[in-house]
Design a protein with these regions (language model features):
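Long low-complexity, repeat-rich segments biased toward Pro/Ser/Thr/Ala that often serve as propeptides
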Residues: 67-70, 157
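Glycine-centered signal
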Residues: 73-74
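Serine residues within intrinsically disordered or low-complexity segments
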Residues: 144-148
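Metal- and O2-centered redox machinery and metal/ROS homeostasis
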Residues: 1-68, 77-143, 162-279
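Compositionally biased, low-complexity flexible segments
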Residues: 151-164
Length: 279
């Protein structure tokens, strides 16, 4: 748990401080003017993009456990919830499932940017993690799940084209996948990964709103504390869906909640030249 706390700490050098989770655009649009508005916004974040990230992170942590994740003590544990060949395909179809759940191109770009930065740091902190190595090398092939079918030309429908050799031609895996693999490397499980994803989804937005509006830090912290019960419940639901998705190799079981308001906010923010946060 101590290593997981390190991963969830905002001071962990993974670039998360540069992102507001659309809070900056929400402030610009007048959606957030005070603590009461912030609380409603955090609930929206947690129940949509937060829930999606939690499901993906939990699934990635389960996969990482099957791959062989090096814990904080350096010991490698082997698990067998999925067979070896399926384990090789999991990152590919999870990556596609993440793409399919982010309607805004700006959100996908921000997720991959944060994924790359977190992966760079996590590889230094947990160098013996095989799952992190797989993500770092992009060593995963064509996804083959009912919700991520493969076209006759070799591309995954709805998730972008594949590069030569059937490998995903993307610069970095999504943040939630790296978070799940890093959580497993830190000795945690799917629930820990889901909690970290959910807290990250609301924590970044809360911190950004505090800085942008000069809110009372104690009031903002109280908002986050009030969400603890909801975060625990959402994490449990994410683990249940992730476990079933991995067992059945069916990514459609993962949470897929979205918000058109957040998608549009993400796109508007990306087009702005003057801004404090990258997303």
């Amino acid at each position: 748990m101590t290593a997981l706390a390190l991963l969830a700490d905002s001071r962990f050098p993974s670039g998360g401080h540069a992102h507001s989770g659309s809070a900056e655009e929400a402030v610009s649009q007048g959606w957030i003017t005070g603590v009461a508005d912030l609380e409603r916004f955090l609930l929206l974040r947690m129940s949509t993009s937060g829930a999606v990230a939690a499901g993906l992170a939990a699934a990635a942590a389960i996969w990482a456990g099957a791959t062989g994740a090096t814990g904080a003590t350096g010991a490698t544990e082997e698990h067998d919830p999925i067979d070896r060949m399926a384990a090789c395909r999991v990152p590919g179809w999870l990556d596609c499932e993440a793409d399919a759940r982010m309607a805004a191109p700006a959100s996908r770009a921000a997720s991959r940017t944060q994924g790359r930065l977190l992966l760079h740091t996590a590889r230094r902190v947990w160098p013996r993690s095989r799952a992190l190595e797989v993500l770092d090398r992009g060593a995963f092939g064509v996804p083959s799940t009912p919700s991520s079918p493969v076209r006759p030309d070799g591309g995954a429908t709805g998730a972008g084209a594949l590069g030569a050799g059937g490998r995903l031609s993307r610069s970095a895996p999504h943040h939630s996948l790296v978070l799940g693999a890093a959580a497993a490397a830190a000795g945690s499980d799917g629930h820990g990964a889901a909690v970290a994803a959910l807290y990250g989804a609301v924590g970044a937005a809360a911190t950004a709103a505090l800085r942008l509006l000069g809110l009372d830090p104690m009031a903002v912290t109280s908002c986050l504390a009030a969400l603890c019960t909801e975060i625990d419940a959402a994490a449990a639901a994410a683990v249940a869906s992730a476990t079933m998705a991995i067992e059945r190799s069916d990514g459609s079981i993962l949470p897929s909640h979205g918000s058109i308001e957040l998608d549009l906010a993400s796109q508007r923010h990306a087009r702005k030249e003057m801004k404090l946060f990258a997303s």
